[in-house]
Amino acid sequence: MRVSQAQALENRRRAVAAASRLFRERGVNGISVADLMKSIGLTTGGFYKQFPSKEALVAEAAQASFGDLDLLLASFDTTHGDHDTARSALVDFYLSTEHRDQPGTGCPTAGFAGDMAREPTAGEVRDTYAAGVREFAAWMSTDADDGLPSVATLVGAILLARATAGTELSEKLLESTHKALTAPHGPRPGILETGAERQGPDAT
């Protein structure tokens, strides 16, 4: 039976939405085209009527995932009024056990990181990912920096917390990183002191 144009567009939307979730949850190589299409009640043949390759779907799914992230960040701004408060609330969410335990609906910066690190060559997917990281960093930026240190810290922490899920270390990673990112700005004790200053004024 011939599928209408409207139904074809809906099938494509569902495939991209499912891929966006499953790729973040299982990794690009952790889900086959057949299993992806089965999850939305469609056939593999239907996939190739919509996409030239799995790589094309990965690029579209990554773009859709970062679009969802943009909407999430905008909602934090709307809900919390001023950007500093919104940024703090985002850190609270990002370093939560809820975010750790639900990668399929979580941040694509972390969700696609492993696959992007294994990408052998530059291309549309990597360009999409890099653009998403830059936009996330811009949202996290402050007068003190461009947001990249915060994004790197958040993503690294959530990846490690997921990798150690079920252990005490996982919880500690989330808590310690949250404490570090929300501490008042300023030099940490001992970091910028000279050896003599640490030993006290009577040091010789």
Question: Which role does the model predict for each range below?
Answer:
Residues 63-69:
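Short, basic, alpha-helical segments at the C-terminal edge of helix-turn-helix-like DNA-binding modules
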Residues 1-10, 187-204:
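N-terminal intrinsically disordered/low-complexity leader segments
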Residues 8, 83, 87, 146-150:
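Short amphipathic alpha-helix in the helical subdomain of ABC transporter nucleotide-binding domains
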Residues 86-89, 100-130:
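Amphipathic alpha-helical segments used for helix-helix packing
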Residues 90, 94, 109-113, 150-157:
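Short alpha-helical scaffolding segments that buttress acidic/His motifs in well-ordered protein cores
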Residues 60, 74-106:
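Hydrophobic alpha-helical connector segments
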Residues 14, 22-56, 60:
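Helix-turn-helix
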